[in-house]
Design a protein with these regions (language model features):
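A structural signal for long, well-ordered, hydrophobic/aromatic- and basic-residue-enriched core segments
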Residues: 2-296
């Protein structure tokens, strides 16, 4: 349950030696040294094909790490209203530290089979499903016959304008909208969305499916966010989307920790981005005034 709805749900503490709650079998921390040498290592990849996938698609792709949202500082904005009925607190809070090699190995080794991702990371086998994501994120999924795939939807312009503002600007081809044409608080919500809910590194424009996700969020339409996270992760694994970043890194790291997969002693956490606060809103407003809008492709 979100802080905006009542009190905060505290995430699992990363400090101290607490027992793992979701381990298939006991697994101590690895003591081996791990370097990205470019040489196939059967301890790190389930097959040579997985190693080739890692080398060609993931090794040089940067991580897009989720940003914690300082919910207390935003209580005087509209953000609390938009999240009031959503129990997405874990998605907005500090999850586990992300470890670059582990995250990339997760994606390179994973295989998507329908509504299941079969995973293999450093010898551990496990599966990820929308139901599993809901369990570890403590989210009550809405009952939807078929959760919409937002990437495949093309909503009517007027539907978007009614919720997102009459001044909403569309790109010349009509396939995306300008984030700068949104109100300051909607731009802040978009920043939260692009970081934690619908990962996107290029934030100047968003496609119509992403705009509909934003529309549904502020109009309190049910969103099966676990199904959509699964969809994004699966697309990244299959590389069916044109992506220049690797999403949900801290969520993946949380899954790995729960499954008893740990970084080696020489691995260090990926730098955490700054949290999203009321100061982020003020900085965004100032930046928009100083910089003209530039159109970019939204994928």
């Amino acid at each position: 349950m979100s802080l905006f709805k009542s009190s905060a749900v505290k995430g699992v503490c990363n400090k101290g030696k607490k027992p793992v709650i979701d381990v298939d079998e006991p697994s101590p921390k690895s003591k081996r040294t791990h370097f990205s040498t470019g040489v196939y290592d059967p301890d790190l990849f389930r097959s040579y094909a997985a190693f080739q996938t890692y080398t060609s698609q993931f090794r040089d792709t940067p991580l897009l790490v989720e940003r914690a949202v300082d919910q207390h500082s935003l209580l005087d904005t509209n953000i609390p209203i938009w999240f009031a009925t959503k129990d997405w607190n874990f998605l907005l809070s500090n999850l586990e530290d992300a470890y670059e090699n582990l995250v990339k190995e997760f994606y390179a080794n994973a295989i998507v089979e329908g509504e299941q991702i079969k995973c293999w990371v450093r010898g551990k086998r496990f599966s990820v499903t929308p139901v599993y994501l809901a369990n570890i994120l403590q989210i009550n999924r809405p009952i939807l016959p078929i959760p919409p795939v937002y990437d495949e939807l093309t909503p009517d312009e007027e539907v978007l304008r009614e919720a997102l503002g009459a001044n909403l600007e569309f790109s010349s081809n009509g396939k995306s909208i300008s984030v700068a044409s949104l109100s300051p608080e909607l731009r802040l919500l978009t920043m939260i969305m692009f970081s934690n809910l619908y990962p996107l590194s290029s934030t100047g424009y968003m496609n119509l499916g992403q705009a509909l996700f934003l529309h549904d969020l502020i109009t309190d339409i049910d969103i099966d966010v676990c199904s959509y996270i699964f969809h994004i992760v699966a697309k990244t694994i299959d590389w069916t989307a044109s992506r220049n970043c690797i999403p949900f890194c801290r969520l993946i790291s949380r899954i790995l920790k729960l499954k008893g997969v740990y970084p080696s002693e020489d691995e260090r956490p990926y730098p955490r981005p700054s949290p999203i606060t009321i100061h982020t809103l003020h900085a965004s407003m100032s930046h928009t005034k100083k910089n003209p809008k530039q159109e970019s492709h939204a994928t």
